[in-house]
Design a protein with these regions (language model features):
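Structural signature of FAD isoalloxazine-binding scaffolds in flavoprotein oxidoreductases
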Residues: 220-223, 229
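Conserved phosphate/anionic-ligand binding catalytic regions in large, soluble enzymes, centered on
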Residues: 200-217
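Long, Pro/Ser/Thr-rich low-complexity/intrinsically disordered regulatory tracts in eukaryotic proteins
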Residues: 2-17, 23-198, 213, 227, ...
């Protein structure tokens, strides 16, 4: 059965020493070394930035990114969690061969063998939201096929054999769905998917059986938190079949007033029904957050401006910053930016900081393992380099 037909069916569903005065030359070389190190660090920092951080897209002041994930498995091979090492290798080799043969579609893509990366490099990919924590812990015969702009990714041997993922800035659920659906249609021409007429697409996680679709959006909801409305509202979100999690999804800690909202089940719904339902709930959350911001303004504009200004002052001048404190301060500054109280700080910069201040990225920048104290020190350095 063709993919399009199935989607309408059960899925309803990064000097050589010169001659001359040794003293002067040594000083010059030191300056060059320092400059060179700075260039390398800038290059590394740039490598850790991707499209979803650019601060554009609809409702980008509240919705940081939208993501679609489509789980698929190969018929006749056990799910990765049940597969032997030989079976995982078979899946890896098969998909690697397919990706290399399909030059028309994947010629510009990069195939990243995760077992060939250091733990820190894998952690960076997680912090960029490109792979899961599972793939950091279990990288053997796992891979990431990544588009040049890092919008589209295909994860190999994660929870399922294939996880197609699109990640876009702002509220762009439909566009993200179109991206994964297009790749899914293309791959089904060359892969025999595990599919059941009664249930739909078969997946390792029971809640994904049917369409295999997980739709989500990452929201910044500071006003709802500050006004004390967040628990009531998130409880209501849970009652309509949606999950509320931290920035990295299931099991991740909620911090910086960031909340990831996603669907929990797919069976009995079409893909469009899933993402449109999520879209409707997110729009309600956006309206409630805007109303709460007006409430804060009415209670005292100067209080809000002072809050953002104090947060900016600490971020710009503190010598040591813990992760949780930094996230909270970035949230305060972001609220000030979003409400027109703080000038000259693009949302793009604040989005990038959400990733750059994390332990993996900090250690990647310094090319070594850092202690807790060293991370706090480097975190303040990086924040002050980024903020105007």
């Amino acid at each position: 059965m063709k993919n399009n037909e199935r989607k309408q069916g059960r899925g309803k569903k990064v000097f050589k020493e010169k001659e001359g005065n040794p003293g002067l030359q040594g000083e010059t070389e030191k300056e060059l070394d320092h400059k060179g190190a700075g260039i390398i660090e800038d290059q590394k920092r740039a490598e850790m930035i991707c499209t979803w951080m650019d601060g554009t897209g609809p409702e980008a002041d509240i919705v940081i990114n939208s993501r679609m994930q489509l789980a698929r498995n190969i018929k006749g091979i056990p799910f990765p969690c049940l597969a032997t090492e030989e079976q995982r290798e078979k899946v890896f080799s098969l998909l690697e061969k397919i990706f290399k043969e399909q030059q028309e579609r994947f010629s510009a893509y990069s195939l990243i063998n995760l077992s060939g990366l250091s733990p820190i490099k894998r952690q960076v990919l997680t912090e960029k939201q490109l792979i899961s924590l599972l793939m950091v812990r279990e990288p053997e015969y796992s891979a990431l096929l990544l588009s040049p702009d890092e919008v589209m990714g295909i994860l190999v041997n994660e929870e399922d054999h294939l996880l197609l993922q699109a990640l876009l800035p702002g509220l762009q659920l439909e566009k993200a769905w179109e991206a994964v659906s297009c790749h899914d249609d293309y791959l089904e021409e060359v892969i025999d998917y595990a599919f059941c007429e009664e249930l739909g697409y078969l997946t390792a996680c029971p809640t994904k059986v049917g369409t295999g679709l997980r739709a989500s959006a990452l929201l910044h909801l500071p006003a709802l938190v500050i006004t004390g409305q967040i628990n009531r509202i998130l409880s209501a979100v849970g009652q309509v079949g949606l999950a509320v999690e931290g920035i990295y999804g299931e099991g991740s800690q909620m911090t910086g007033r960031l909340f990831q909202i996603s669907n929990q089940v797919t069976l009995g719904q079409t893909e469009e029904e899933i993402w449109r339902n999520l879209y409707g709930v997110i729009n309600k959350l956006i309206n409630q957050e805007r109303a709460a911001r007006e409430q804060l303004l009415n209670a005292g504009r100067e209080k809000l401006a002072d809050r953002a200004g104090r947060a900016y002052g600490i971020l710009k001048h503190a010598r040591l910053l813990g992760f949780q404190e930094a996230m909270q301060l970035i949230s305060d500054v972001r609220l000030g930016v979003e409400m027109g109280m703080v000038d000259n700080i693009p949302l793009k910069t604040l989005n990038e900081l959400l990733v750059l201040i994390r332990s993996g990225c900090l250690q990647n920048l310094k090319e070594k393992t850092l202690s807790h104290y060293e991370r706090d020190l480097e975190r303040s350095v990086q924040i002050q380099k980024c903020l105007p």
